[in-house]
């Protein structure tokens, strides 16, 4: 286990973009892509009802960047305008649509895999990263991909292995329950919305502990005690009595990376195709993941 913050993710994303582009604007777009992310990160997407795309917390990104005068002056001194770095979606190396591989996706899955299920070690990460290169996809756009089919397969398989954790009701219950705790705290004015951007998650949890101990609001206390004390999530087709139950579909995070074919020449660049077109096992693995569905409900007894 190790500490992994949104800042570290953003710096890592920027470093990957720089490694493959040496472009300041793309790199800064990667660095600032999550500045509007509040405490508890994607939990707030659940609170906003955005479980399928989990992008609602990005909505204020451009606004926050464009309102920062100090940042504007610093960028201008380097000949860069804020509009050139306020949306990393315009740079396909930084971000692209699933199932493509981007710096953002490449970065978050390595530490996530290390912490959630220990699927990577540093030697594996170094081996796989050394096989990543900028390739051209079917739309003629640059995209991160692999020089070696085996490396692409190993990365895809472990990516899906980690992503499967997020498809289970255990994760859905945890995310939605914490989202409801935050919502109740805001409804009761136990915290203010701006504190999600000014107070650390550790400090907020300590505040929640104290609020629950003092039982300042019965509904908040019940939600929080359940979150703190739940042991086993029941997988059911119907909601259970005397239980907190969740039924929600969530974003399916996976990659079907490009693989370079041959070496190419100056007049005829090497082509790249999706891994699933080259490897039947990869195709089956992806299809199995996409077809997976947990039971309709995940439930935990109220505490």
Locate the predicted segments by residue:
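Short alpha-helical catalytic segment bearing the HExxH-like zincin motif
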Residues: 26-34
